[in-house]
């Protein structure tokens, strides 16, 4: 009964009967703008937004998910309603079901709930491909606070690219295992990673983490470093470059690769251990590749070799393919 109730609620959305009351639209606009303004007080949000703008010139990945403030102010109720009427349609949706159920009965239930919904006439969407970065770009932000941050982002492959799995293992070796999306796991330390040992244990940094994401189109591989109060971003960048050069020039020992695979595999297991996350990942994988991507994820990680890691480092982790960003704290109330 719970499944049917939730499915019925979801079908109400796709019946396209929501009214988008103008007063409710204005109320939500206020909430979202307030959320954005709160994020603008966070140094890493400001730095990340500026770096995405620098990394992409044409692709929508140029923009943060929450959008630009000027767009939030400009968008009208009719714009939202038309988007809803066009895209919230059964021919633009994927239903995923995870849990204890009988397949035949579940399919009948889904047909009963969704079967009468009318498809929408979907416009052809053309997303302009982003040209490769050919020169290192730099972003520097200053503002209130006491902490310096260094963030370096490299162009990374899409989730359905054959290099993605080797890149995932490289990330685990370099900065520690990281969640592929918001439905990630936890409890896996990155203290055995190369950058933790090179930066945190030497007190050049307070923390370091990476974060390869599973995306539809090629996105970014960010490495974020919180600089130690007595150190500089430039010193940390030099050490980062040294560790990347090691990956490019020296084969990673097999034992280190197996440990990294084990950590990445464990994090993925934590992130998909409950049925909500399983349903999310099945649907999400179907969007950017197919659900087989999820089914074979662990097996693909286990195929990665030292040669693969070296090739990924040589191909993707090059200075011309990156944006270097620094947030420098000041005593000012505002920033540049």
Protein language model annotation of sequence segments:
Residues 99-104, 229-232:
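Helix N-cap motif at beta-to-alpha junctions
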Residues 292-295:
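C-terminal soluble interaction/assembly domains
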Residues 1-10, 14:
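Single conserved hydrophobic/aromatic residue that forms the stacking wall/gate
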Residues 1, 38-91, 116-164, 182-234, ...:
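Non-catalytic beta-strand/loop surface segments
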Residues 12-20, 113-121, 241-252:
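A common structural junction motif
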